[in-house]
Every structure is written in structure tokens, then in C-alpha cells.
């Protein structure tokens, strides 16, 4: 599709010469005539006529081996493999730099949204302050359905699997791992730090109930799983967790399986990038964009290319990624407490003792929460900013009530 447009943009023809797939019959049917289909990917890497290898296998295992072999053979690489780059990016980018080849990965983050190019090139003049994004369509679909239909997580997950929005094993999505892979890559590009997935704080949506969605709405918020990375005086925050977003914000109204990324730069202010974060066509759009970039720069000196992580390798920052215990932010608490006098005073006393101030509070009648005759009720508290370590201390005391 759009071959003429692509040729006009690239300035040279780009030809698919070989495809490797264990199911060669399926691959041949998809590739069409004139394309050599093999079962062994190393045959593609070994072909001296091939300039660019596209890796769409996924995972850390054979994909890593093949990417490193392609780089060692002097081939440029295009990949959509966020997990591979988030975990092994430092090794892969160093190998690419050594061998003078490019590794392009627009499709690894937010599918059809060109957020990597925006961060690496479009916002070059800016000092990036923070990034916050809905970067996993599965969890955004689940949270949207929980809000719209008032259903619990487990029920909506099954529906998401039936519709094809969630994998048979959805762990990476619902536990926040997929979003953390993407946030790790954006953080490295935004702040010029090595990829450090092992230092990211990762929390998924499995502990959220329908009542949390309802209470957030009553307080004027919507719950979104956000990937957040932020520059602070002490270091870089890198975290994924459910977040309360004011309902009037544009990003709060990103529904279904769509993605959106907000970027704050000192010159441009807040910018928002929105679109399809997954799917065959959005992914293909990003892969082809990378192919065109490499075709334009094929043969160019390394100094004329955009560095993999936007900053020159010798200029990477040593700013630390902060542990979550040092992050300062506000909190949503849902406490299921005894419906009796004095409990509220104890809770507020614990928070005050930890130096945590309350921004807003809801208290439900016990029969609203557990039905007639219930003796437990929900106490919902929004706090002002405080350090996570203090909140953890306060939570430990409240759990003992």
C-alpha cells in the first residue's frame, strides 16, 4: 500500500526481499510473489544483499540473539520489541554504535503515534520536564468498561479477552509491565539516561474495584494507568501505576484501547499525542516510517544520524532513577473501616502524625457499601503531596486499626 508515496518520501525504492517465519506457508501467502520465504531467520541475516532487518518476533530470547547477530553483520535493524530494548537496550545500542548501524524502534512505543520521533527530534530544543501517558490499550479499555458499565475487573478482563483486546495471558498488560517497558524507553530519550527498566516502579490495575472507579468519579476524577517519568532535583522518576486524572483533562477522556502521551517541555509547554497504540496497521505505519528514515540515511556518517537515545553516547547523564520511596506525589486511599465512632479521628491522626494533609474526603454509609446491617464502611481520602515513604508508614499503622 502507498508504495508510490513511500518512494517519493524515501528517495529510493525499498524492497521486501526475504521473510523468515516458522509457518512458511502462511508467510508466503502474506508476502506474495517475488519474496523468498525461509524458516531460518539467520538465512536472512546472512544474505549480503539485505541492508535492513525487521524484527517482529517479540520477547527477550531468540529476538535478542538475532538482533545482535544482524548488528554484527552490519545490518540496520527496525524493531517493535519494547521488552527487548527496555531490558537489553544498553547492550544493543552499544553494539549498534560500535558497528556503525542504526536501530530504529518507533513501533515499540504507542504504536502509530510518532512519540519517539517527537522526543528525539521534534522537541530537541526543549528541556523535557515530564512525560505522562496512557500507553497500554488493554488496561485503558478495561478501565473504560469498568467505569461505563460498573463492572468489576475480572468480568471486564474476560470480555477484553473475548474481543481480542487482551492476550490469553494478560499479565504484562494488567500488571503494568508493558507500559513500564515503554515508559523506560521514553525516559531514556527524554532525559539522556541509560535504559533502566529494572529501576522502574511497576503497579498494575488488578487491585482496582468498580467502587474505586465510582468514588473517583464522585470526586471529579477518572482512573487511568499512567506511565510517568519526571525530572526532579534529586533524579528521575520512572513509574507506572493507576492515577487519578481530573475529569476535564483531555487525557482523562481517552477511551477504549486508544493511547495518549503528554510531554511537558520548557519551550513548548504541554503537548499531547493521541492515536492507536496497537494493531497491525498502526504498527506497520511506525515500522515503515523507520524504514524510510534508514533509507534516507543509509550510507551517511554516524555523526549525521540522530543518536538512538537522542543524546550522543558520550554525553549520557548519570542522573539516578529514584526509588519509589523517595517520590513525592498525592494519594487516593480507600479504607474499609468499622462503622463506629472514633475511627475517622484515628485515621486523620495517623495521617497528621506522618505530616500528610488531606485534600478531600468521602465517607459512605455502611448499608451503601455492604447492604443492610453492614458494620463496615468505605472511607475515601485524597491527600496533598507527600513522600511515598511517609505514606507507607501511615498505611502500616492504619492497617493495624
What do these predicted regions represent?
Residues 76-78, 358:
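A short hydrophobic/small-residue beta-strand
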Residues 269-271, 275-281:
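Glycine-rich phosphate/pyrophosphate-binding beta-alpha loops
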Residues 10-13, 170-173, 194-202, 224-225, ...:
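Flexible, glycine/charged-enriched surface loops at secondary-structure junctions
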Residues 57-73, 80-121:
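Rossmann-fold NAD(P)-binding glycine/threonine-rich loop
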Residues 1-73:
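N-terminal glycine-/serine-/threonine-rich beta1-alpha1-beta2 phosphate-ribose binding loop
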Residues 286, 291-401:
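A conserved regulatory-domain signal marking ACT and ACT-like small-molecule sensing domains
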Amino acid at each position: 500500500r502507498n508504495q508510490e508515496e513511500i518512494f517519493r518520501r524515501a528517495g529510493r525504492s525499498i524492497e521486501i526481499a526475504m521473510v523468515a517465519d516458522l509457518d512458511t506457508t502462511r508467510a508466503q501467502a502474506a508476502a506474495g510473489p517475488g519474496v523468498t520465504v525461509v524458516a531460518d531467520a539467520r538465512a536472512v541475516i546472512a544474505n549480503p544483499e539485505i541492508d535492513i532487518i525487521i524484527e517482529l518476533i517479540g520477547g527477550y530470547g531468540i529476538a535478542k540473539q538475532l538482533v545482535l547477530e544482524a548488528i554484527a553483520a552490519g545490518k540496520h535493524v527496525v524493531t517493535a520489541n519494547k521488552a527487548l530494548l527496555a531490558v537489553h537496550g544498553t547492550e544493543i545500542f552499544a553494539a549498534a554504535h560500535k558497528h556503525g548501524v542504526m536501530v530504529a524502534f518507533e513501533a515499540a512505543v504507542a504504536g502509530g503515534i510518532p512519540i519517539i520521533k517527537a522526543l528525539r527530534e521534534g522537541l530537541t530544543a526543549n528541556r523535557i520536564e515530564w512525560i505522562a501517558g496512557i500507553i497500554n490499550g488493554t488496561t485503558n479499555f478495561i478501565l473504560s468498561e469498568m467505569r461505563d458499565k460498573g463492572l468489576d475487573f475480572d468480568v471486564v478482563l474476560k470480555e477484553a479477552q473475548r474481543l481480542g483486546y487482551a492476550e490469553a495471558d494478560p499479565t504484562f498488560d494488567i500488571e503494568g509491565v508493558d507500559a513500564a517497558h515503554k515508559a523506560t524507553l521514553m525516559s531514556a530519550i527524554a532525559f539522556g539516561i541509560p535504559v533502566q527498566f529494572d529501576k522502574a516502579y511497576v503497579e498494575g490495575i488488578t487491585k482496582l474495584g468498580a467502587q474505586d472507579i465510582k468514588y473517583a468519579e464522585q470526586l471529579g476524577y477518572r482512573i487511568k494507568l499512567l506511565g510517568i517519568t519526571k525530572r526532579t532535583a534529586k533524579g528521575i522518576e520512572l513509574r507506572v501505576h493507576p492515577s487519578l486524572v481530573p475529569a476535564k483533562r483531555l487525557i482523562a477522556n481517552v477511551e477504549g484501547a486508544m493511547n495518549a502521551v503528554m510531554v511537558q517541555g520548557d519551550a513548548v509547554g504541554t503537548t499531547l499525542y493521541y492515536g492507536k497504540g496497537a494493531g497491525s496497521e498502526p504498527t506497520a505505519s511506525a515500522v515503515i516510517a523507520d524504514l524510510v528514515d534508514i533509507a534516507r540515511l543509509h550510507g551517511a556518517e554516524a555523526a549525521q544520524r540522530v543518536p538512538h537515545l537522542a543524546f550522543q553516547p558520550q554525553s549520557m547523564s548519570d542522573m539516578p532513577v529514584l526509588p519509589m520511596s523517595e517520590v513525592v506525589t498525592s494519594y487516593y486511599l480507600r479504607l474499609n473501616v468499622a462503622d463506629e465512632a472514633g475511627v475517622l479521628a484515628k485515621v486523620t491522626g495517623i495521617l497528621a502524625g506522618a505530616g500528610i494533609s488531606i485534600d478531600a474526603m468521602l465517607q459512605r454509609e455502611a448499608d451503601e457499601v455492604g447492604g443492610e446491617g453492614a458494620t463496615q464502611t468505605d472511607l475515601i481520602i485524597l491527600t496533598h503531596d507527600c513522600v511515598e515513604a511517609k505514606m507507607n508508614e501511615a498505611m502500616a499503622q492504619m492497617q493495624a486499626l
